[in-house]
A protein has these predicted regions:
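Non-catalytic, soluble scaffold/interaction modules
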Residues: 1-227
């Protein structure tokens, strides 16, 4: 908090998705803060190279998630394994891949722009569904897209095990199931996010780890900083 905010107490209302009461120092976690560029390709000869960039980012994203799975198998945290499987399957989904490639080819845009359009397409489909659980699965598509975008940008994907201090509450705009599953329980006592819901895969992982969590706080990241 800033010095001004520290002088007063304020209450934020969210959705408790995993029970418990904790007190700890804040650790701001921004895993999705990649700098993304959207641009048109000025030469059709660049299209094959752009498609190759996209495919390489898919491969790297798959490799990263498989590594996370292997690390989790060495622990007692098994619930996230099937959820990460879902993300890996999406990375090889032909409709997802072909739609993105089609945008690159037909519109002459870079892979990042094409990927964002693919995400928008899926958002329209999921948001029109009445079932809250199924419509909430758009978050899984978003997590996968963000990982691909970060790999396209060449930026390192920040991981929760980078937390140096102990007894911290992770505060983030959002957390993927993979991010949550990698939290070291001897260092992290709970987490709070701006977005998210009770039926999200991240919430399921938190409950399986018995990690106190509140999501859907809208703007908690505006009020706090690490420490």
């Amino acid at each position: 908090m800033t010095s001004d905010q520290a002088k007063k107490t304020f209450v934020l209302k969210g959705i408790g998705v995993s029970p418990g009461v904790v007190i700890g120092k804040v650790y701001r976690f921004d895993p999705l803060d990649a700098q993304i560029s959207f641009y048109k390709l000025n030469n059709s000869d660049l299209i094959p190279r752009e498609i190759e960039r996209f495919k390489n980012a898919l491969k790297e994203s798959t490799r990263q998630l498989q590594t996370i799975q292997e690390n989790l198998k060495k622990t007692k945290v098994t619930e996230p394994l099937y959820i990460i499987d879902v993300h890996i399957l999406l990375l090889s989904d032909k409709k997802f891949i072909n739609r993105t490639i089609k945008y690159i080819q037909r519109l002459g845009v870079n892979a990042e722009w094409a990927l964002r359009m693919t995400l928008d397409h899926y958002k329209q489909i999921f948001e029109g569904l009445d079932d809250a659980y199924i419509s909430g699965r758009i978050s899984d598509v978003q997590y996968v897209v963000q990982r691909i975008l970060r790999n396209l940008s060449g930026e390192k994907h920040e991981v929760v095990w980078d937390v140096g201090m102990g007894g911290v509450v992770i505060v983030s705009h959002d957390l993927s199931p993979a991010d949550t599953a990698q939290m070291k329980l001897e260092k992290v006592v709970g987490f709070a996010t701006d977005s998210g819901g009770r039926t999200s895969h991240t919430a399921i992982v938190a409950r399986s780890m018995e990690l106190p969590a509140v999501v859907g706080l809208d703007n908690v990241t505006r009020f706090v900083r690490t420490g």
